[in-house]
């Protein structure tokens, strides 16, 4: 069986066209990531003595690590005079002031404000804010318990368990991680490549009428169908994993650092309400797994659509249309209160920021289940149903073809 899976994988997914697309899409993704860095980072002004890039990393050596009152005082001792000097907007705009770090007072203030003061303030204040959320949830749980509202009590208890004790004890550079976690372009490339690769899995056999011959071969029929499904699964998982980790490598190479991966994911502002208590690196691994689950479920849907056609063009168009419908519905519900819609749409697992970045629950049998956890179960169940349909319908479809030929 392993040899048959290997044969199907090489035959279907090691074609020159697929390998060429793999290379082209990977390069396009890396160029896009580098473009994000050049467009949005303020540390791209070269490596001169007075550049933001050089000064930032010099200051970072001083302030990184555990947030202490001593570090805060040192930072404010530099920052506060700059605020006072520039608050009325009458300070000199000269760019060669020898008494400044960057050559300009306003530039000095902006550098410290963006990369040190604001992040450190957010880190310092976050524990207090999360503790307030936890306390309110605990009070709500007690109140709902008195009223006999069991589900609401359980939901409030789950929120308390998530937010109690959240802290960001250390200061670290977070810009690279911020852009990485909010990057979606590779998802489009993953879907296009997976669609192009999987859509011909059954079509090629029907085009040459090999599907009828397989019925009487030793490894034909359902055994070959199972091998095709497993080979397609392997292709979908490898493609999804490749782009997930290519994103991380691309951002780390562009920003020239892996700094920030040890921070908790809620150190990124738009993940302040994250439904997981993980480090950013752990989040990367979870995100990759969720993307694999989403890509696999959508891929099985494409396989089911394609198995009834002799020409690849029509199922490709149909698969692309299905994909666009999932994307459109996912985008429409991404930041809405339609939690069930997000959980049922496998595309949400690909753009899992909308699931993991918010603490949202759905009611399953009176128990609050986080939307990302529910989405995994729904995707796996849907995928297994699709696999079963492909497995049993494939042989039946071939028998009908044989009867028509007779």
Where are the model-predicted features located?
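Alpha-helical transmembrane segments of multi-pass membrane transporters/translocases
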Residues: 14, 18-21, 294-302, 355-406
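Secretory targeting signals
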Residues: 27-77, 128-205, 226-308, 328-330, ...
């Amino acid at each position: 069986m392993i040899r048959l899976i290997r044969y199907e994988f090489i035959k279907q997914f090691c074609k020159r066209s697929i390998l060429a697309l793999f290379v082209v899409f990977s390069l396009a993704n890396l160029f896009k990531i580098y473009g994000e860095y050049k467009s949005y980072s303020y540390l791209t002004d070269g490596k001169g003595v007075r550049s933001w890039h050089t000064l930032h990393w010099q200051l970072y050596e001083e302030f990184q690590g555990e947030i202490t009152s001593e570090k805060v005082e040192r930072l404010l001792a530099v920052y506060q005079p700059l605020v006072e000097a520039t608050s009325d907007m009458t300070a000199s705009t000269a760019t060669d002031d020898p008494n400044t770090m960057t050559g300009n007072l306003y530039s000095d203030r902006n550098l410290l404000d963006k990369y040190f003061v604001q992040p450190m303030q957010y880190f310092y204040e976050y524990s207090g804010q999360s503790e307030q959320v936890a306390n309110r949830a605990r009070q709500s749980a007690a109140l709902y318990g008195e009223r006999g509202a069991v589900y609401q009590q359980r939901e409030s208890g789950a929120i308390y368990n998530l937010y109690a004790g959240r802290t960001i004890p250390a200061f670290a550079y977070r810009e690279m991680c911020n852009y990485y976690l909010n990057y979606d372009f590779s998802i489009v490339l993953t879907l296009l490549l997976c669609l192009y690769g999987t859509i011909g899995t059954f079509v090629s056999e029907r085009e040459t009428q090999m599907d009828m011959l397989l019925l009487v071969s030793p490894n034909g029929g359902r055994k070959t169908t199972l091998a095709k499904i497993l080979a397609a699964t392997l292709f979908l998982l490898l493609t999804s994993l490749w782009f997930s980790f290519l994103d991380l490598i691309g951002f780390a190479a562009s920003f020239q650092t892996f700094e920030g991966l040890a921070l908790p994911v809620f150190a990124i502002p738009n993940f302040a309400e994250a439904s997981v208590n993980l480090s950013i690196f752990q989040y990367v691994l979870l995100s990759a797994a969720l993307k694999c689950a989403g890509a696999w479920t959508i891929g099985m849907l494409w396989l089911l659509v394609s198995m009834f056609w002799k020409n690849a063009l029509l199922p490709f168009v149909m698969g692309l249309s299905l994909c666009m419908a999932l994307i459109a519905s996912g985008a429409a519900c991404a930041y809405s209160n339609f939690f069930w819609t997000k959980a049922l749409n496998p595309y949400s697992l690909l753009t899992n920021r909308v699931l993991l970045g918010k603490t949202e629950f759905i009611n399953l049998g009176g128990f609050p289940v986080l939307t990302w956890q529910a989405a995994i179960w729904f995707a796996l169940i849907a995928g297994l149903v699709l696999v079963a349909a492909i497995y049993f319908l494939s042989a039946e479809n071939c028998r009908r073809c044989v009867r028509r030929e007779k």
